[in-house]
Design a protein with these regions (language model features):
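N-terminal secretory signal peptides that target proteins for export/translocation
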Residues: 1-3
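Sec-dependent N-terminal signal peptides
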Residues: 6-15
């Protein structure tokens, strides 16, 4: 009986020591000030639409391209569609908008860095930023009659050429006319509010790899 009591006492002491050790183990603490990157996928396969994005909240809003459109068969005008609405119709506070592979900003400026990972961009570039520019008959808005050789274009669009470099078009000389690859670069965008964002585009197609215009990107948004 005495031996049994001694064994029980030893077990209790060991249990207390194990509990004490587990309680003394420090809990991991989050790194102060570290910003976690977010990820977003935008279905931009409809040539008629732009998806407007609030990088701070993750909200999106889809609108038809607001400009007038002209459809061509080679150099011959087939039809014209009048402008409808304006960017004032966008209800969210938007930072960037995506149309297929095209990107524009809300009065922002963008620069391409030499880095390929978001967390490697620890300081913002001080030069090289480019604002959006107006382009004519560059943005395709209607491919519904492509098999008849008819393609519709926005008569005027605002695009950010720097951000548009996220995907590289490689002519094939046959059909399909292009193959694509990612630039892999991290882009920095400064907004008129004083906020900024780092973006890296990571995919241009859906999970099957067969449907282009499904745009995925990771980003870090920094408010003013």
């Amino acid at each position: 009986m005495k031996m049994k009591n001694l064994m029980m006492l030893a077990l209790v002491v060991c249990s207390m020591m194990m509990v004490g050790c587990s309680e003394d183990k420090p809990e991991p603490k989050p790194t102060p000030g570290k910003t976690v990157a977010k990820k977003m996928t935008v279905d931009a396969t409809n040539y008629a639409d732009w998806t407007y994005i609030n990088l701070e909240t993750g909200e999106t809003e889809v609108h038809r391209d607001f400009s007038s459109w002209t459809s061509y068969k080679r150099d011959t005008v087939i039809s014209r569609t009048p402008a409808k609405g304006s960017e004032a119709d966008v209800k969210i506070k938007w930072h960037i908008a995506i149309h297929y592979f095209d990107v524009k900003t809300n009065a922002g400026e963008a620069v391409a860095t030499t880095e390929t990972e978001l967390d490697k961009v620890t300081t913002l570039p001080t030069a090289g930023y480019k604002a959006d520019t107006l382009v004519r008959k560059r943005v395709i808005t209607d491919m519904s009659k492509m098999m008849q050789g008819i393609i519709g274009y926005a008569d005027q669009s605002s695009l950010n050429a720097t951000l548009g470099g996220w995907v590289i078009r490689i002519p094939t000389g046959t059909m399909p006319p292009y193959t694509y690859k990612l630039s892999e670069k991290v882009y920095v965008v400064k907004f008129k509010s004083g906020a900024n964002a780092k973006l890296k585009f990571t995919d241009y197609s859906d999970a099957t790899g067969q449907k282009n215009g499904v745009v995925t990107f990771s980003y870090v948004y920094q408010a003013k």
